[in-house]
Amino acid sequence: MNLDDIAKRTFLVIGRVGMDLSPDPPGARTKDATQMVVAMGGSSANIAAGLVKLGCKAALVTCVSDDAIGWYCLNQLDHYGVDRTYVKKITGE
């Protein structure tokens, strides 16, 4: 199997999506950082995004909170082209 064969496939990835905060400048200790860089986190979400980047179709099965962090995660999944049909918003947590 080569990369062209993989790119024709559809993947269903089960796991977490989240928001990563990294200190800026890189290498700074978190407690000393004056700025933070925000990025999509969660190994499953990043795997799904990587599969899409390789030309595959990928959907993520997960839950997100119905708040600013959850909305950020949904926007990032859209940005990377990950199908979020199976992403459920959880309220009241």
Tell where the protein language model's regions lie, with residue ranges.
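A short, structured active-site edge motif that brings together acidic residues
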Residues: Y86-E93
